[in-house]
């Protein structure tokens, strides 16, 4: 599992935006945000996406430990790089979208070192919850002032083994490791 995550985000922002203090609540722009994944399919890759439907992000630019992240994904809207994979992905042997239409992540800790951050939390897939760690990077829009934290892009990345969540269908053809990238476009809640 990958290590650095939200801690990096928080530390980068703390260095870039020293004027603000305390946790700041952010709202998600779901239309501009994405969750993508890839896994091995023999010598090829299966790629896809799952809609990001909700996020509760509270970022403290002076104390990473005060940051919290909660995210929900719509499994029923999952897509993949070819039709059979999309159907199989949502089926009972993999994500079982009918029985488990939502996937969630809730942070339990945020740490940082230098300009890197790690968010550790609980990921729930198919009703099974396991701890995972994600790396985080935070970006301001080009041309924005260094002190402007009103709109940000947060990029989270990590890896999970689908078998850890009981998603074992087609294991003879499809890799166990799934690489995930979440790009969340957020703005300060008013």
Across the structure, where does each feature detected by a protein language model lie?
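Positively charged n-region of N-terminal signal peptides that target proteins for export
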Residues: 1-4
